[in-house]
């Protein structure tokens, strides 16, 4: 994997930094594992914007990624690594010994030709998935299930990982990248290793158009809006907003705690680092 800084042959190329991975498959994705992925422009069923800065972008198919890893005891050979436009991590197409193909999140170090496995008896090796009760304390893991059987929800993006730091009865304690220490059920599954493509964070799109290709619309500052649109709007000439920074709905944006899920507080051993 290489980091390529483009020559400034034009204004649009001047600031571009690319992540080039020669190992990625250059052909089309595996068709049986594709689904239609319709765009909604950030609107809900009433047509109202519920998520800002979304709209346009290139058409994409959704890749059906296996986040459950429930084919126990059947070895799978990695056929190829692929780009996935729906996530920051790359994905791997694996062929199981019984003939079935599935996509999985590609962990760091995984290459075409490697053999992976899932299940309680799988060896401790990058790419293998198993219940967390079978994973040694101190191991680095990703694709962590919060609810056994539901599928992975934690540590799925490029370069992400968690560390299993303790085991206590029916629970294990994880240290997440944010610094949060959290208990999860030990019956839930996780995959050994960390997610690959960690260099994703080093890329620079270089121009607004590259963000538009990805379906990202512009962000407008509140101080340049009208009073009807934002608490910072209005005023004659340039203003500072006249108050501490808030969202368009008046919620403070600088360090204000918004976590309200009291139901899961008992599972958080230590809050994330500030």
From Swiss-Prot:
Which UniProt keywords are present, listed alphabetically?
Ribonucleoprotein, Ribosomal protein, RNA-binding, rRNA-binding
Q: Name one GO molecular function term.
A: structural constituent of ribosome
GO CC annotation: what is one?
cytosolic large ribosomal subunit
Q: So what family is this one in?
A: Belongs to the universal ribosomal protein uL2 family.
The protein's gene is named rplB
The source organism is: Vibrio cholerae serotype O1 (strain ATCC 39315 / El Tor Inaba N16961)
Q: Where is this region: Disordered?
A: 223-274
What is the designated name of this protein?
Large ribosomal subunit protein uL2
- Which Gene3D superfamilies does the annotation name? 2.30.30.30, Nucleic acid-binding proteins (2.40.50.140), Ribosomal protein L2, domain 3 (4.10.950.10)
Under the subunit heading, UniProt states: Part of the 50S ribosomal subunit. Forms a bridge to the 30S subunit in the 70S ribosome.
Role = One of the primary rRNA binding proteins. Required for association of the 30S and 50S subunits to form the 70S ribosome, for tRNA binding and peptide bond formation. It has been suggested to have peptidyltransferase activity; this is somewhat controversial. Makes several contacts with the 16S rRNA in the 70S ribosome.
């Amino acid at each position: 994997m290489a980091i390529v800084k483009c020559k400034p042959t034009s204004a649009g190329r001047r600031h571009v930094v690319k992540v080039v991975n020669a190992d990625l498959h250059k052909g089309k994705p595996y068709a049986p594992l594709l689904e239609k992925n319709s765009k909604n422009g950030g609107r809900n069923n009433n047509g109202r914007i519920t998520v800002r800065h979304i709209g346009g972008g290139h058409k994409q198919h959704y890749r059906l990624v296996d986040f459950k890893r429930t084919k126990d005891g059947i070895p799978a050979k990695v056929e190829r690594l692929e780009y996935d436009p729906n996530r920051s991590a790359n994905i791997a197409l694996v062929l199981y010994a019984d003939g079935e193909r599935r996509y999985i999140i590609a962990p760091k170090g995984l290459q075409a030709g490697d053999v992976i496995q899932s299940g309680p008896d799988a060896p401790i090796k990058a790419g293998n998935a198993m219940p967390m009760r079978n994973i040694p304390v101190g191991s680095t893991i990703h694709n962590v299930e919060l609810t056994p059987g539901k599928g992975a929800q934690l540590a799925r993006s490029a370069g992400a990982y968690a560390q299993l730091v303790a085991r206590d009865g029916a629970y294990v304690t994880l240290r997440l990248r944010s610094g949060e220490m959290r208990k999860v059920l030990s019956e839930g599954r996780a995959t050994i290793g960390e997610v690959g493509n960690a260099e994703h964070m080093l890329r620079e799109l270089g121009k607004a158009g590259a963000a538009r290709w990805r379906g990202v619309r512009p962000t407008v500052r509140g101080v340049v809006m009208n009073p009807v649109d934002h608490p910072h709007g209005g005023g004659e000439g340039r203003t500072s907003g006249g108050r501490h920074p808030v969202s368009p709905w008046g919620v403070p944006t600088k360090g204000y705690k918004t976590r309200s899920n009291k139901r899961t507080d008992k599972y958080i051993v230590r809050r994330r680092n500030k």
